[in-house]
Every structure is written in C-alpha cells, then in structure tokens.
Amino acid sequence: MKPLLDITDVSLSYHSLSGETPALSHISFQLMPGEFLAIVGPSGCGKSTLLNLICGLLRPEQGQILLDGTPVTSGDCRIGYMLQKDHLLEWRTIYKNVLLGLEIRRELTAEKLAYVNQLLSDYGLDKFRSAHPSELSGGMRQRAALIRTLILEPDLLLLDEPFSALDYQTRLSVGVRH
C-alpha cells in the first residue's frame, strides 16, 4: 500500500537579522491511508511549522512532501487545514461561515448542503446556524471551524490545536465520526 503522506528529510529554518533559527531538521515519516497521527510537544517546537509545510503554506528548504505520490502545493484542495485560530468571519452567520469553502469551490450541491446540515446537527450547532461567531463560546466557534474543514471532505485532515476549546464529549466524537 502506498503512503497517503510521505515526508522525506524535510528541514526549515527561520531567517532573521540575528541569523538562522532551525525550526525543523531532517524530519521523515509516512502516514498510510486511514491512519491517525498526533504531533505533540512543547510550545515552539515546530508543530505548527510542520503543518504549514504539509499543507503547502511554507516550502521546505530541504526534502520533499508528497500527498498520494504527488508534491504538495499551496492551496492543495486535497488537504483540509483547521488552524489554531478559528478564522470565522464575524459578519457571516455560522451557517454562512461553514459554507465558505463550498462557495469558493462552487460546490453548493443539494448533497453537500444536506451534509452541512448533518454536521451542524452532529456537532450541536444546528440551533446556532443563524448566530454570528461573536455570539458563540470558544468551543462552539471551534466546532464551526471544524465543520467548515470537514465539509470539503479532504484526503488529509490537518488540525492545529484542534481540541483546545472543545468539551470532552466533542473531543471523543471527532475521531469516531470522521
């Protein structure tokens, strides 16, 4: 079986006036289809940097990152990435926020809208579809951002600090459902 994600000898340094700071050095691993991987470590150890490399927001100075055998590029639709901050648009309702990726991709089909409604129900946000982000708790906002990512049905799902504001029950259900 071919790996879904293949990272080989990836390195990256941040450049500043005071010199170079290594962020990641010679990272290699594979992720097979259906596998889960948790990257844990203290603040500043490079977890978010690695996720930014995997999704193509950053380019490695060395090494390669392949998704299903092809190089990852910025804006790769095969990757869903939920950032640390939810980045919900305050002027849009929760429902409109969740639809954003589908609108951009022009994928607003009846099937996708039914899936949106199912996810809103599954994650306890169906009664808040007309609310704006400022009206929701941190955990509810994070669930909305998760739904916005899941609705695009990516081949690879990257979650940066995904559970920091989620309650225990929601944390348990994320891996079970998706």
Region locations from a protein language model:
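Signature (C-motif/LSGGQ) region and adjacent switch/coupling loops
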Residues: 20, 75, 95, 129-132
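Conserved ABC transporter NBD signature motif
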Residues: 63-75
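Conserved signature/switch motifs of ABC ATPase nucleotide-binding domains
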Residues: 131-134, 148, 152, 159
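The feature captures the beta-strand-to-loop junction immediately N-terminal to the Walker
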Residues: 40-42
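Conserved ABC ATPase "signature" region
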Residues: 99, 110-128
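Short coil-to-helix segment of the ABC ATPase nucleotide-binding domain corresponding to the Q-loop/switch region
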Residues: 92-99
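Helix-to-loop junction immediately C-terminal to a conserved catalytic motif
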Residues: 55
